[in-house]
Structure formats: structure tokens, C-alpha cells
Amino acid sequence: MGRSRGVPNSGDDETNHRSKRRRVASSGDAPDSLSAACGGAGEGGGKKALYHCNYCNKDISGKIRIKCSKCPDFDLCVECFSVGAEVTPHRSNHPYRVMDNLSFPLICPDWNADEEILLLEGIEMYGLGNWAEVAEHVGTKTKAQCIDHYTTAYMNSPCYPLPDMSHVNGKNRKELLAMAKVQGESKKVLPGDLTPKDESPFSPPRVKVEDALGEGLAGRSPSHIAGGANKKASNVGQFKDGANVAKVEDGHVDRSIGVKKPRYSADEGPSLTELSGYNSKRHEFDPEYDNDAEQALAEMEFKETDSETDRELKLRVLRIYLSRLDERKRRKEFILERNLLFPNPLEKDLTNEDKEVYHRYKVFMRFLSKEEHEALVRSVLEERKIRRRIQELQECRSAGCRTLAEAKIHIEQKRKKEHEVNAQKAKESGQLLSNTKVVHKTNRPMKIESDGNLDQKKGGASLDSTGRDSPKTTGHAGTKHWDDWDIVGFPGAELLSTSEKNLCCQNRLLPNHYLKMQEVLMQEIFKGSVAKKEDAHVLFKVDPAKVDNVYDMVTKKLGTNEEAPTV
């Protein structure tokens, strides 16, 4: 293999090639300060990842080497390559690449060019946010250093998303190394305690890069670098493996890694997630509109053996899927643009009738702009208000009012009278409910729990624990006080004749129960299963006397004989 690695790396060839570039110590033509810094980091990490020649096993880390483009992870030194050395399966006629030594500073004095490449490769491989793996891929930098460098040099660059290369354009390797060496020497004369602002010479809006390079603030050791990164950690969030960080007020950072986004206050309205499942950080709904759009092509794949018809069909499925995504995007943008996730301030002061009109007019939002729709709704509500006022004035004129003062008095009296009528109705309904409590039971008749005094004094029918009416007081007492049982207002009362109403009052039956008993009796009589009163007793869990009375009414209406009804 081209190098020895402490941790084996799995994955495709491209990942192996990139992982091979991981290094722990920088060597070669790098200045002493950089070598010491990288060496210190390597010793702290305790991992070795050096390149070596696959033929002579010579250490070629930090030197120019020849990399085979065909054989994976295969390197040769210049001497072995010059004599055409071959190691199975490598052959001397394989294509190759010349890998130059990149151990020189480029963007920052404390970051070499090869470390920059490893940083970007690590972010591409492990994702932006998996900084522990990225730092391990770089090998010579800590997690905090990687975050701080990427935030400063890339995210906050004036040339975003590219780093600022104006201070190195036109300079060769020797000039860059000399520049880093000068900065390393000037670091010794600087005071040890620096403020956070002085330790950020590579932030273009605050300190010019040329001045920073001249002052030599960047040639500090990794310990100082880590300390500076910790001091600036408030701009990039709290790190799990970082030390105690000091928060620094800095309004410069506009693009940062790990910064908490501002939350919506309670005054701005209900939470987005509570209303619709909208995630403001991802700008997505959960679930999305047409959430099953991806299922149509989840298992679809293009194969070389596909015919033209199959290929055209798959392309059409893709076009349909894209149109569904466009509709999903349109709806989401429409909701966010119209601010439909929060209550409209216009709706707060509306009456219930006006709110109903407001909601009915929401269907026209898709055809109008936001301003046009609000103007339409306001005009409709204003029209309703004017129409109500005109109707009130017409009623006042019909009542004989001739001035606005008289009309105002008439309207107040009318409202007062309506209020009294409503209060009287509510009082009557409350008395009715207090006298009789209706309890609905599933699949059996409704039970009536009357006041105990009425049951005892007026002969009301009581219910035993089995659901059957107790016949002890249902007889003549119920007939004597039948007028006390008023069924007016109960559902189904308007469907009964006078004789049927009297029957319900005498037997203390609800209209719905009577109609149901009548329906069942008619069906059974037509079937022939009920020929006399005793046959109907088993059909209902009520007092047999009530069943007999209902049976008599049904047979009377059918015009049949009580004992032998004709069908």
C-alpha cells in the first residue's frame, strides 16, 4: 500500500484515495514553526498516516511522489519511478499523476494548502456539521480549529463562497514560506495575552489581510490557535469537546456554523408547528402536500435493456413527478407569502357572521394578490355593515321614527326586548331540563330520570336496575296525572297526532321511542310474528302495559283485529 494507516477506511475507491491523503505531521520544505505546530498536533493525536513507496518502502511524506491512476492506493518515489519499478498488479505503462508537496501556507499562515484540501474533502465526505470526522480526516487540526477556520476563511469571506485569495495571488512557494517564517518570528515579540479581536487577523471586514500578514499574528502555535478558537466560539456555537468559552459580542458574523436561529416570540402568534407541522428551519411541512408523490418512482430505474417505449414511459413518469413537486413548491410558497400560518389581525375584531364571510372568501385568494384580496374582503364586510344599517333605518321608519335620535331609541328598545325574550326562553328551557334529565343509551330506549317527588306523588314510572320499567306506580296514577308530562319541544313530537300525543303523555313515553315502537310493531305484524299483545311483550324492555297501549294504537291505525291482524 502507498502508506500505513492507523485506522482502516472502507468505502469506494474515491473515498480511499481521499482518505489516503490524511496526514498527521507536516514535513519537507515547511518552516520550523509550521513543522513544530503540526508535529505537536500529531503527537497529541497519536495516529500515524505517512506516505511510503510501495516498492522500496521509503517514507515519502511531504515529498514529491508518483501516484498510479489505475492501481488504487499505489505510490512510488521519484527514484523507483525513474527506473520503471513494477509491483504486481502495477505496471510501468500505467497512467500516473505527479503529487507535489503542498506543505506551504495559502489562505492562513497556520493552515497549509494540503490541510485546506483535506478540510474541504472531509466536509464533502462527512457533511457540513460532522466536524469530529472532518477533524480526524485533516489529522493536524482539532474540531474547534476546523470550525473556526471554515467560518472565518470561507463563510465570512468577502468573496463568499470562495476564500479571499487576494493576498497570495502572484506569489510562489518560496514567497509564501518566507511570509509564514516572518510571521513565526514576529510572533515571539507579541504579548502573550491578546484580545479576541486581535486574534482574528483574517477577518477581512475588521483587519486587512496585508496588515495582518505584516504584523505576524498568525504564526502562533496550535495551543494559541485553539485558545483563540475557544474565545470566538460564541460566534460559531458551543462545541461538545471545547473548553469553557467566553462569549464575545461580535455583530460581524453573518454566516456561522451552529448559531442558534432566533425563535418566534409569543406575541407574534401561535407556533408554526402547532398550527400546521411547518418546520421553519428546514422550510418544510410534515407531512408535505402530495406526500406520496415519490412512491411512483421509488423503485424505478433506467436499464440498458429498456426499450424506447419503456424509456419514454419512465421519462413521462419523471415529468409528472416534477410537475407534482412544482405544485407542492407553489402551495408552500403561497402559504408563506400570504402568511397563512398565523392568524390575520383583520379577523380578530370581526363578529361571528363576518368571520364566516371572511372564511368563505378565502377561496378567491389564489386569483388575487395579497393586497387585492384584503381590499376585496374589507369592501364586502363594509357592504354588509352598510346593508345592516339600511335595514335598521327602514325598520325604524316603518315604526314611525322620523329622526336619528328616535331611531336610536327604537333600536335600543328592540334589542332590549330581544334580550328579554332570549332570557325567558333560556329560563324555560332550564326549568324543563331540571325537571327531566334525558340520558341516551346505545341500542336501548332512553331512560327518564324524573324528580323523586314527582315519581312518588304523581305516580311516575320508575326504572329498575335491569332497564325495565317498574309497574308499581304506572297504572291509574299515571293516567290521573298524564297532563303533567309535556312532550312539546321533544324531537318527533310534531309527527304525532293528538291521540298519539295523549298516549305518550299518559304512558310517559318520548315521541322518538313511541315512533320506534310503532315501527317495530308494524314490521312484526306484517311478518306475522305478532298476532296478539303477549307476542309483543318480548320485543321491548319496558312495562307490558305500555306495550299493550302502543299495540292497541297500532292495530287501530291498521284497522286490524287485536288478536288476529290481517296483513
From Swiss-Prot:
**Residue numbers spanned by region Disordered:** 1-34, 444-480
- Where in this chain does the record put each SWIRM domain? 476-567
- Provide the tissue specificity: Expressed in roots, mature leaves, stems and panicles.
Recorded coiled-coil stretches: 288-308, 405-429
GO cellular component terms, alphabetically, are: nucleus
All copies of domain SANT, residue ranges: 106-158
Q: Which GO terms describe its biological process?
A: chromatin remodeling; regulation of transcription by RNA polymerase II
**Zinc fingers (ZZ-type) span which residues?**
48-104
GO function terms (MF aspect): chromatin binding; DNA binding; transcription coactivator activity; zinc ion binding
UniProt superkingdom: Eukaryota
Supply the alphabetized keyword list: Coiled coil, DNA-binding, Metal-binding, Nucleus, Transcription, Transcription regulation, Zinc, Zinc-finger
Pfam families listed in its UniProt record? Myb_DNA-binding, TADA2A-like_3rd, ZZ_ADA2
State its location(s). Nucleus
Q: Which residues cross the membrane?
A: none
Quick one: which residues bind Zn(2+) 1? 53, 56, 77, 80
- Tell me which InterPro entries the record gives: ADA2-like_ZZ (IPR041983), Ada2/TADA2 (IPR016827), Homeodomain-like_sf (IPR009057), Myb_dom (IPR017930), SANT/Myb (IPR001005), SANT_dom (IPR017884), TADA2A_B-like_dom (IPR055141), WH-like_DNA-bd_sf (IPR036388)
Query: Where does the chain bind Zn(2+) 2?
Result: 68, 71, 90, 94
Ranges annotated as biased composition (Basic and acidic residues): 446-458
User: Could you describe the subunit structure of this protein?
Assistant: Interacts with GCN5 and WOX11 (via N-terminus).
Please explain the role this protein plays, according to its UniProt record: Required for the function of some acidic activation domains, which activate transcription from a distant site. The exact mechanism of action is not yet known. ADA2 and GCN5 function to acetylate nucleosomes, opening up the promoter region. The ADA2-GCN5 histone acetyltransferase (HAT) module is recruited by WOX11 to regulate crown root cell proliferation and stem cell maintenance of root meristem. The ADA2-GCN5 HAT module together with WOX11 targets and regulates a set of root-specific genes involved in carbon metabolism, cell wall biosynthesis, and auxin transport and response.
Q: What is this protein called?
A: Transcriptional adapter ADA2
Q: Which organism is it from?
A: Oryza sativa subsp. japonica (Rice)
